[in-house]
Amino acid sequence: MIYFTVDDVIDKYKNSYWSRSDENYLLSNVLAVEYSDIAKVLNKEYDDVIYKIIKNFLHKEYINDIFNKKYRDGEGTSILRKKYKLEYITDTEIDKIFRSA
């Protein structure tokens, strides 16, 4: 199970990008930039910005785990589904969730 705070996510993603249409928006390369200001620039709610960052964070972790050899058998898949709380949805549904991130 993954436990992290919004602060953990912001710290991890402070030099990452927000993708909207075909443009990339810098989330934060300047320490003084507040995420609420970024949300205003993107015309988004603050929570939507954080939610998207969290989904991207989970997606990267999930993909890393999928390609980890220790998770390549049936038992490994079950462990991953439990870790990400995805036991009750199909692989196709998981893919759709992450594509919308």
Residue ranges and their predicted role:
Residues 1-101:
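Intrinsically disordered, low-complexity regulatory regions
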